[in-house]
């Protein structure tokens, strides 16, 4: 079985890593659109366009299922993709919501994500349907900090403090959704700043959503494609995955031409 995944950059590799721990035999094709990262500050229409191009690329790799390893796309383009393609397409938002519902005892949940994810209100609407009080905050600098390999630095710590200082005073919140697949890479800094809050990530929670779709069979291959490959990209892939990979380049213009 072949799983396709895509994200705006390297953050979706946190999803790939979680999936690979459970499904060690499947074949995985990953596309990171590093030439156009971040998606979270772009319009819904642009996100849909980019998402269609990425999904179409994966379809052409003969994948059996697509995991949208990006909250901005899951929030703004999943319905459009499901209408366009016939194979199963799974986003990360529902998994994050389910994890938060299991985690929270106070029924007060914080959500952090890109501007596109927070402004979509998808997390808020899903949680409020279960009578959960939500507190949402966009953290647009977190993705560039990760993509620039500034993890666990003074810069990342200052950004965490800048964006999350209001959560320090919201004593009822016991759970914080990391509503972007890049954000688990800042988990150490976030946990140090908010030690009293449980952090949940859709990158881990997605496993329960694909159990009925994915069969653990294949040749255990992993192909990593990126629309821009810099030294940072290679180093981040090794940092996240714990090993080196042969990264493959895809021209971003070819994505549009073949869609």
Curated annotation (Swiss-Prot):
Keywords: Cell shape, Cell wall biogenesis/degradation, Isomerase, Peptidoglycan synthesis. It comes from the Bacteria. GO terms for biological process: cell wall organization; peptidoglycan biosynthetic process; regulation of cell shape. PROSITE patterns: ASP_GLU_RACEMASE_2 (PS00924). Substrate binds at residues 7-8, 39-40, 71-72, 181-182. Its EC number is 5.1.1.3. This is Glutamate racemase.
């Amino acid at each position: 079985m072949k799983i396709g995944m895509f994200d705006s950059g390297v953050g979706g590799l946190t999803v790939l890593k979680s999936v690979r721990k459970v499904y060690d035999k499947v074949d995985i094709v990953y596309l990171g659109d590093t030439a156009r990262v971040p998606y979270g500050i772009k319009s819904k229409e642009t996100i849909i366009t980019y998402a269609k191009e990425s999904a179409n690329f994966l379809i052409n790799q003969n994948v059996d299922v697509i995991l949208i390893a990006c909250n901005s796309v899951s929030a703004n383009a999943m319905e459009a993709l499901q209408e366009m393609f016939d194979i199963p397409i799974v986003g990360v938002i529902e998994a994050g919501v389910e994890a938060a519902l299991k985690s929270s005892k106070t029924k007060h949940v914080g959500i952090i994500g890109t501007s596109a994810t927070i402004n979509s209100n998808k997390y808020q609407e899903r949680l409020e349907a279960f009578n959960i009080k939500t507190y949402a905050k966009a953290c647009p600098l977190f993705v560039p900090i990760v993509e620039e390999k500034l993890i666990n630095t003074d810069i990342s710590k200052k950004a965490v403090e800048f964006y999350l200082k209001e959560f320090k005073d919201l004593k009822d919140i016991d759970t914080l959704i990391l509503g972007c697949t890049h954000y688990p890479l800042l988990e150490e800094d976030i946990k140090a700043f908010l030690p009293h809050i449980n952090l949940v990530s859709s990158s881990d929670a997605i496993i329960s959503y694909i159990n009925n779709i994915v069969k653990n069979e294949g040749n255990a291959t992993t192909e990593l494609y990126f629309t821009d490959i810099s030294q940072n990209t290679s180093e981040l892939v090794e940092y996240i995955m714990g090993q080196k990979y042969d990264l493959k380049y895809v021209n971003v213009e070819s994505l549009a031409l073949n869609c």
